[in-house]
Amino acid sequence: MDRPQPKPFPLAPVAASILAERETERRNHLRQLGYFKTACSEIDDYVLLGGLERGHVVGLSAEEESFAVAVLSRALLEPRQRALVITPKPAGVILRSLRDGVAAELAHEGVAPGDVEPRVRASLDCVMLSCVFDMDGLWEVLAELDRRGRASSPPGGRVPPSPASEIQDSEEDEGPSPPSPPADAPPSIILVTHFSSLLTSLFARRERPAAHANLSLLASRLRHLSRSLPSNPLVLILNSTTSSTDPHGPEPGRHPSAAAGSGKPLDPSLRSIFNPPPLPIPGYVPTSSRRNKPSFGLVFTQLLDLHLLASRIPRTAEDAEVALGSAALEARFVTVVEVLLDEMGLWTGRMGKRPNREQRWAAVQVDGGRVVDAFGKQKMAAVTEIRTSAGFGGRRP
């Protein structure tokens, strides 16, 4: 059943200066609340220039979901943070990844082994999980979340029950744990996993105009929730990727962004900086390139304020030769996280031009359940004295 079209109603005119003042106050408030970190300095400090902002809709197109799990794991270690995970897949896969991610972060922080398990249970208690099977299920969860947000606005109002069940690992075990947020608190992070599966089901069951209209309304609803809920949540949507050399990609007939093979050039906002446009040579086929791009292309991008792409590439030139050759050696890969689209720019607390993060990238890898810099930090040895021939030179007094 298609989403009902909203009926227009008269609105009183509002001066643009008032709207700008309200938006400035909102962005300053979000900046004071702080960013969500991935615990990887290359991504937080260089690529994102601080971290993931609250009150934004962020998309991650990746071959793996370790990056999103790292963001969620790190956020759950902060006090009074709650998360809502919406997934069309079995819950066990997400729970195992989340448990391992939280445990890895605690071990990295130096938490005693005996205190890791109670802290992991306390973190999982702050996660709500909703399993949906299609886009209608996603709409129901978001609608219930919106109703709870409106009910919590009046002072003294009673909040309805949560739309999703909380994860309870073990209610019998007791252990020290940090203070948990109230049970009726809205989530600080809304994570939607395997979004390409929901899009595939949507375009398979509905006509294309109706599907696009549904997604347009979904984009408005996601932005409304990220900006209107009291918690100003970060909405993180996980999307898959396709490549020109992937024989098991989504069905081209139902794929809105199937530009490969049709001669249509790829939109610049979807192209990785590591996948330049093919050479305009008649008959030239770049068989050695692996052109990774987000699934559903611009259809997915219309939902987002910030779009990240995570691609696996060979670690070194030697690994690239091994990957392209037929040798029995195993090539090493790293994951490159880059910003494809930064619709709003980074708010710095003042008017004027905002820093744009497009085409910023970092090479990372998963090490022990954590996302870390792939090449590490190299410390340069301090030169205390420079000697030259005949004793001349050296540090000046």
Residue ranges and their predicted role:
Residues 1-24, 38, 153-185, 249-276, ...:
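Fungal intrinsically disordered, low-complexity polar regions
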Residues 49, 74-81, 104, 108, ...:
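Short amphipathic alpha-helical interaction elements and helix-loop-helix interfaces
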Residues 84-204:
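Conserved inter-motif catalytic segment of the P-loop NTP-binding fold
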